[in-house]
């Protein structure tokens, strides 16, 4: 078989980097190679189809929170799967699976082929036990979850609390949350083109409660974006904390005391 055409994808270096990252996270751990993708696409092409593609996705999420001075590692989840789509005339057939083995891929491709052959547009969830990736979890260089270790994540939230309490003695309670997400997508089309996207997302939030004369008010601050946890340097944290504390104090001072 001829080598897959990359289209104009060689023009932008980051695109190739993203593709390499996606392949290492979405294909490598499950023993999938370019050969398996081509085989799955060829399986669908046995029926007359106008277009076909494979869609791989993995989303990893981690959350940490601080309350009452204690940091809890909240949630950690990995959501992943593969979707197979074929278009024949007016018909669109789509099947997806949670597991990403070679068998699952071919199974989904055969399901799509039979739907397309029957001439009905349908979406099908193909059975199979969700597959857990091999134990050594790979972090892409762009994965924000891997940019700080757990000790650093704890230290970051403790710093938020320390700064907030130091701002004003009326601050009686501090809650902080840290969330990181890494979304990797890869599409393989029947014409040989391959595309990938790697999207990190991080967020830091802080909520403070200030108390004066028995009355309590709440203020919050925070922010984030599509980058690593290294973004949360002292000046950024300071800004979020200032915003939260000032909001709580403004609320305290704005209402007349009866």
What does each model-identified segment do?
Residues 2-258:
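Active-site bordering "gate/hinge" segments
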